[in-house]
Amino acid sequence: MAATVRRQRPRRLLCWALVAVLLADLLALSDTLAVMSVDLGSESMKVAIVKPGVPMEIVLNKESRRKTPVTVTLKENERFLGDSAAGMAIKNPKATLRYFQHLLGKQADNPHVALYRSRFPEHELIVDPQRQTVRFQISPQLQFSPEEVLGMVLNYSRSLAEDFAEQPIKDAVITVPAFFNQAERRAVLQAARMAGLKVLQLINDNTATALSYGVFRRKDINSTAQNVMFYDMGSGSTVCTIVTYQTVKTKEAGMQPQLQIRGVGFDRTLGGLEMELRLREHLAKLFNEQRKGQKAKDVRENPRAMAKLLREANRLKTVLSANADHMAQIEGLMDDVDFKAKVTRVEFEELCADLFDRVPGPVQQALQSAEMSLDQIEQVILVGGATRVPKVQEVLLKAVGKEELGKNINADEAAAMGAVYQAAALSKAFKVKPFVVRDAVIYPILVEFTREVEEEPGLRSLKHNKRVLFSRMGPYPQRKVITFNRYSHDFNFHINYGDLGFLGPEDLRVFGSQNLTTVKLKGVGESFKKYPDYESKGIKAHFNLDESGVLSLDRVESVFETLVEDSPEEESTLTKLGNTISSLFGGGTSSDAKENGTDAVQEEEESPAEGSKDEPAEQGELKEEAEPPAEETSQPPPSEPKGDAAREGEKPDEKESGDKPEAQKPNEKGQAGPEGAAPAPEEDKKPKPARKQKMVEEIGVELAVLDLPDLPEDELARSVQKLEELTLRDLEKQEREKAANSLEAFIFETQDKLYQPEYQEVSTEEQREEISGKLSATSTWLEDEGFGATTVMLKDKLAELRKLCQGLFFRVEERRKWPERLSALDNLLNHSSIFLKGARLIPEMDQVFTEVEMTTLEKVINDTWAWKNATLAEQAKLPATEKPVLLSKDIEAKMMALDREVQYLLNKAKFTKPRPRPKDKNGTRAEPPLNASAGDQEEKVIPPAGQTEEAKPILEPDKEETGTEPADSEPLELGGPGAGPEQEEQSAGQKRPSKNDEL
């Protein structure tokens, strides 16, 4: 027994330790349950959150607006973000950065960089010598990359979300344009890393919009495919997307709605910003014409004036969307000269005529990539702020040939809502209704490599090969494996973009490098030397195009295989037990597939032999993993494996699902079948087949990024530190401003209070003069030296003033509380006295309170009355300017003491059982009164209210209870006058108590 106890103690300690760890994890998880999304537009961003109790809500910024400008102002000692930075664009346009997302992932010679310089000449862009990208130079000491500026914006968006959610947030889904390539997507991920955000996914903004549309129309989606076109014209670009909605059967959740991106078309520079720039140029021309002959400078040479004109152009574009003409006016545009000019919608449309001609372009691209016609499109829905321009809607309606354009979606917030729904689905803290999302690859990716071939005996040459890895408009996320079968030494291969013929010449120049990565493999020859007796199954490279659309090379392996013959005696008991357990939890995978870490290899289909003449060139060495993504929908059963895979006789379906248990498969070891029956005699006579053993050797990989090198880790660490220092400086600035505002507010409020009657009654003239003089001195100091004062100095000044005014404020506050507190005390004393008087009137036989308890209550009541009268009398003698002796906290203490005594007696009366009356000498109780009715004599005992147990009637000693059930098994019913007929009949059937039974 002692040994058993000793064994149980460690187990109990271990259990408690596990419980503590789980509770700690739950508490930590509850602190970070909220997730957020950032719809990152060119001009503004929308932030949404999901947290327990708050489903999918748009975050309001500090100005209570639902969208925030993507603007940053950087100065030597301060930084502004959002609306504050937008206001600084007029005062300091050089330090105010906008539309910097157009520079992400671009090198200095990119046409987009030159376009940015022409649009915003006030910004100084310098070349980063390490990456050949550009940096903003505010001053020689202030230089920031576009990724760093974007990191500031993302960090600001998180602070807005955390203030709104009232809890920390670290997980986010960020929207990016669908046309972003690999370099641009990696730049956004690096910016999020600088901001300390964990990116759950980079979701395309068109996909997020389509998801938001589908989530709120889930009931309208059925097995019939519905094709919807979304035309999104924002500030910086235009994207047209064709989406197919229908319900599909999934492995995890059965029939669920799905959206599939079928076609995408885009124009990188067509948007509201270009329209505003055209209007700005028109207004600048009008202003110069108005000042012609005054020998004035060109307004285009004044950055502040151009910033004012751009703001007015933005307003004009909005107003002209609803009005035929409008008057543009700016006070003090330049050199204190006001500007005023009339602009009509016709003039605006003439300025942007070539832009409106480009509106149908993305529609045609989307239809072409989807291989659809306009007749197959059921609805065209407008998204984005620039689609509110009437001419855009007119041209688009003519291009699509529909009766009307759909406007049944929030054009500004749809992407943010769809992204936050995806964030909740990806987070482990929420459970949402499944909605399958199948995004599409915009730019195809292929693998290129060179190998030696022998065309003629003795004549060898190099052959260049291309294999498509991810095809255009193919779904992602997706994993692919490519097998190189004819290499036994180290070699290189290249990852590049595929055919980009669908892009125009200008788009190709903006796209940048079409070469992604060069992969150098090391250790291939050593792996062949390590397994000389094994047959090579090729060099397998595993690729992953993740949910964010970012390509990565997971690993490269050299796979070998041989035939091994095992006798039944070679398998030990432990091995059999291990195989059995593995089959139970792993879906019945055979033991030979578990050796040397070959699980992932066994789950993949073998690719056909390299260079097969009877197959297309693109498929000679490419294969896709058999294991689909988690949200992959059910597909038709795969075709019969060929080549080596067919010889293995494996069944990929069984290995994927793991639904077929080990016992249901043919037993290869000659053991009993699932019912325990002996194997068939024919099987016993067959020789045991040899099993295949696979060996996997990891191959070293050296990557050379060709499109745009990522920031080195040391540079990234410096950028993170730079942003943290800026954030800390902003927090210190906010703390200082808060302290200064508190000090200034205290001075003004106290100066006003000194003239109020209730403050003058409790203070002398000398006291008020002392306080007033100190307040005036502090106010003067704040005006003269407050700008250079630190946060500590401001807080010390405030603490000094509060200490000086503490006595005055205390006296006023106490006098405000006296009437309410004294009235409550009087009521409690009166009720307590009445309660005590009633308690003393209770007959001695029924008394539940002892004399000591009642005496104690009486003493407390008397002491409280005496304290109140004495304190009031003493307070009346004191002048109002002195510290009062009647304190509100003392009154509350007296009330609590008295209430505690009363509550004790009330609870005792509530739960005390009545005592039985004493019996007479002959063993009977006193006769009932003569005026008592027969019904009263026959009345049975009813338990008192609040009593937990039912009272039992007292029986005579010589009588016994009849019946098989206890006397208190049923509630007692009232018999006699006043009882119902049913109660009378029930009472008559029971034994009537004698006189001695009555209480």
Swiss-Prot record:
Keywords: Acetylation, ATP-binding, Chaperone, Endoplasmic reticulum, Glycoprotein, Nucleotide-binding, Phosphoprotein, Signal, Stress response. It is found in: Endoplasmic reticulum lumen. One of its GO terms (biological process) is endoplasmic reticulum to Golgi vesicle-mediated transport. Pfam families: HSP70. Glycans are attached at residues 155, 222, 515, 596, 830, 862, 869, 922, 931. GO terms for cellular component: endoplasmic reticulum chaperone complex; endoplasmic reticulum lumen; extracellular region; mitochondrion. The modification N6-acetyllysine is found at residue 883. Has a pivotal role in cytoprotective cellular mechanisms triggered by oxygen deprivation. Promotes HSPA5/BiP-mediated ATP nucleotide exchange and thereby activates the unfolded protein response (UPR) pathway in the presence of endoplasmic reticulum stress. May play a role as a molecular chaperone and participate in protein folding. Part of a large chaperone multiprotein complex comprising DNAJB11, HSP90B1, HSPA5, HYOU, PDIA2, PDIA4, PDIA6, PPIB, SDF2L1, UGGT1 and very small amounts of ERP29, but not, or at very low levels, CALR nor CANX. Belongs to the heat shock protein 70 family. This is Hypoxia up-regulated protein 1. It comes from Mus musculus. The gene is Hyou1.
